[in-house]
Structure formats: C-alpha cells, structure tokens
Amino acid sequence: MNPNQKIITIGSVSLTIATICFLMQIAIQVTTVTLHFKQYECDSPANNQVMPCEPIIIERNITEIVYLTNTTIEKEICPKLVEYRNWSKPQCKITGFAPFSKDNSIRLSAGGDIWVTREPYVSCDPGKCYQFALGQGTTLDNKHSNDTIHDRTPHRTLLMNELGVPFHLGTRQVCIGWSSSSCHDGKAWLHVCVTGYDKNATASFIYDGRLVDSIGSWSQNILRTQESECVCINGTCTVVMTDGSASGRADTKILFIEEGKIVHISPLSGSAQHVEECSCYPRYPGVRCICRDNWKGSNRPVVDINVKDYSIDSSYVCSGLVGDTPRNNDRSSNSYCRNPNNEKGNHGVKGWAFDDGNDVWMGRTISEDSRSGYETFKVIGGWSTPNSKLQINRQVIVDSDNRSGYSGIFSVEGKSCINRCFYVELIRGREQETRVWWTSNSIVVFCGTSGTYGTGSWPDGADINLMPI
C-alpha cells in the first residue's frame, strides 16, 4: 500500500469512528431528555401521610445520583412513611439488664475539653439514641467550673449528643435551662427547658428546632420538670411538671403537648402526696411515670396518664423493697400501694421502676442513706401485692464503694416489642470530694435482655487526684 492509500484508509477509519461517536452522543442526549420528562407522581393523601409509589425520574431536592458516561441523571426516591409513634407493641420479656453504653466523661476531662454537667438522661428517635444533660456553661478544666454544685444558674443549657459521645466543645446546646425533658414524637424532637428566677421561671417548648410555646411559674417556687424523657403517643406528648415546695405540698400538673403547643393541662389527682422528677414510659394507650416523693415517702409515687381524655390517677409502688434514698433497711421498710410510707420521706433521689405483669423491675442505690452504689432487681408481686418483698434477678451496676446519683428510664421500640433501658448518673466532685471545686458526672447505660449475663461493676472510674482542681 502506497503512502496515499494509507492516508486515505486512516482518514476513512477516523471519519467512521467520529460519525459513530457523534450518533452515540445524540442517542444519549435523546435518552436523557426523554427520561427527564417521564414522570409518575406520588399520591399524597391527607393526614400528612405518603403512600408507596413507583420511582420517578425528575429533578427534585431529594436525589440519588446515577452516573451514565458523562451524563448525570437525578432519580427521586419516594419519601419514607413518616408517622407519629404509638408505642402499641407489647413490652419485651426480659431476664435482666445488659451493658449498653458508657461515656467516661470525667476520665476524659482530665486531658480534654469536656462540659461540666449534671441531670443526664437518654432518649431515642425512631432510628438512633441520644444522651442529654444540663451543662453548667463551662468545661471542667476551666475556672468557671468552681462552685458548679449549684443547680440553677442562667448559664445552664440542655446539651444533646449521640449516645456514647461525651459532651465536647462541639456539642449542640438545644435550649436554655436548669431543668428539662425531651422526647421524639416520630416526626421531630420536643424539648422542654425551664430557666429564670426561682420565683418566676419560664418553661420553653421547642419543637423541630423552633420555639412554639411557653408557660410561666404557677406557684412561684422553682418550676421544674422530669430530668428524663417525656413520652409521645399518636402525636400527643405528656410532660409532668411541679411548682412548689420541695419538702411540703406542691402543685403538680401534667401538660399535654402537640407539635410543641400546649393543648391541655391536667392537675395531679389520686393518692400521691408529692411528685417530682418523674421517669416516664409508654404503657399503651397511656403513659406511666415513677417519680420521687421528696416530702413523705421513700416508696415511689406512680402517675398514670390517660392521653385520650387527659385524666390522671396516682398511687405508690406496692413493693415493700422501696426505691428512694434515704430509706429504711429492707426488713423494716413498707409500702401499701396507695399512700406514702412516712419513712425517711424528706429528701430523695430521682429513680425508676416499671411494671411487668404483677411484678416490678426497679433500680436503686445500694446505700440506704447516700447516693452510693447501684443495683437492679425484680420484686415478685411488687406491682400488685402490698408490701411484697420477694426479690429475684439482682444485679450490681455500680459497687457500693463508688458514687452513683440520679437514674431514669427510656424506652426503645424493636421489631416486635418495646424494650426498657435505664441510665445511672455517676456524680463526681463536690460535696464529697473536696479536693476539687467542681461537680460533674458521667453516665452508664443498660438495657433489658432476654439472654444470659454476667457480673461486674461500672463506676465512673476517674482518679480524683489526676483531675483539674
């Protein structure tokens, strides 16, 4: 083949390839335009529900990127069904509790910037669990941490992180408050935060990141709320709030909240004499709370909330092995279901329990007089039989040589049942540990299990001599 023939052959092949490429580009563009105009809209009926639909090819904000050569096609994914939580599944059957999470905040504070906190709790949205606490407006290794034993200052804010993530400097402060409660209704978070002067405080109701409602003090004596999660059923969230004496008659109200708006307020009724710091859980179709009687009883009050008609009843846990601190020893303690036992009732600590048929699961400090150690157990007949004392399935969570503090319940919905979990506040610093000037905490978290489990102790674990003063 002479040079001219080679040139002609190469040119012909190049022209053919170019033509093929050109035609392919035209085909791709035609396909892309066709796909962009091929739409099958989702049906969106009333009640804010989204029905299942076929995938649609259309440019929208919610997109999944699919690459085809050099062309980008944006494919919409139909939104998932978003519903209010109703908590209608049965309670899980458990044999005890297994370790779930520990944040080690105090140990980490020895060498890092970690918030000073107290009054922690845990709550979950439908997909993830979060830990909350009331911050003191300072990190531990900071002179502002001096004298943080005080409960109520204007600098306190509600902190929120994923469970297991200590409250570092990047932690979100969701509202201002020295008392709080939070819960997720299936669509968004509700936060209730109380702040202001003791005699004229304000509770702010923040829903989906926006301030929706508020209420002022009704008894001018330290308006306060649960210090653990509230509960939402079919879009109605219940929050127990108290205003009045911490060691005498107080005025407790149950607030019903829908998307952050107060829709009803019910006064406490029933036989409970004093109710504070309730640990609440869904008991479909209502809500049940186990609280703190800081006046007359070391047996814990029970508050039953009817979400449909706003009615309230109250009583006391029947178990003769009582849950508050201080308390009588187990041989001499009593509870007869309806009234406070008048045994070391003045003072107390936030705690929890939950019913299991006629029985009751509960947690409490191991010490009868101080916030030291922590144990859980089941009392046979403890929900229905006055002064029942048969204890089974006891577990030590924190040994008696180490400090504990507040504790509370939270609920987690599984595929077939609702599990009960609890957290324990592990307080460190003042008043007991006077080498330092701060007061703060870490937490440990356990959840119900139907399996087997071992033994151990999970204290805070920080060496106070290694901590900043």
Swiss-Prot record:
Residues at the active site: D151 (proton donor/acceptor), Y406 (nucleophile)
CDD domains, alphabetized: Influenza_NA (cd15483)
Compartment annotation: Virion membrane; Host apical cell membrane
Residues given in the record as Ca(2+) binding sites: D293, G297, D324
Binding site for substrate: R118, R152, E276, E277, R292, R371
Cysteine disulfide links: C92-C417, C124-C129, C183-C230, C232-C237, C278-C291, C280-C289, C318-C337, C421-C447
Ranges annotated as spanning the membrane: 7-29
EC number(s) stated in the UniProt entry for this protein: 3.2.1.18
Region described as Head of neuraminidase: spans on this chain: 91-469
One BP term from GO: viral budding from plasma membrane
Record region (Involved in apical transport and lipid raft association): 11-33
Pfam families in UniProt: Neur
Region Hypervariable stalk region, residue ranges: 36-88
InterPro entries membership: Glyco_hydro_34, Sialidase_Influenza_A/B, Sialidase_sf
Activity regulation, short description: Inhibited by the neuraminidase inhibitors zanamivir (Relenza) and oseltamivir (Tamiflu). These drugs interfere with the release of progeny virus from infected cells and are effective against all influenza strains. Resistance to neuraminidase inhibitors is quite rare.
Recorded topology in the membrane: Single-pass type II membrane protein
Keywords: Calcium, Disulfide bond, Glycoprotein, Glycosidase, Host cell membrane, Host membrane, Hydrolase, Membrane, Metal-binding, Signal-anchor, Transmembrane, Transmembrane helix, Virion
GO cellular component, one term: host cell plasma membrane
Cofactor(s), by name: Ca(2+)
Quaternary context: Homotetramer.
Similarity remark: Belongs to the glycosyl hydrolase 34 family.
Written domain comment of the UniProt record: Intact N-terminus is essential for virion morphogenesis. Possesses two apical sorting signals, one in the ectodomain, which is likely to be a glycan, and the other in the transmembrane domain. The transmembrane domain also plays a role in lipid raft association.
Protein name per the record: Neuraminidase
Originating organism: Influenza A virus (strain A/Udorn/1972 H3N2)
Top-level taxonomy: Viruses, Riboviria, Orthornavirae, Negarnaviricota, Polyploviricotina
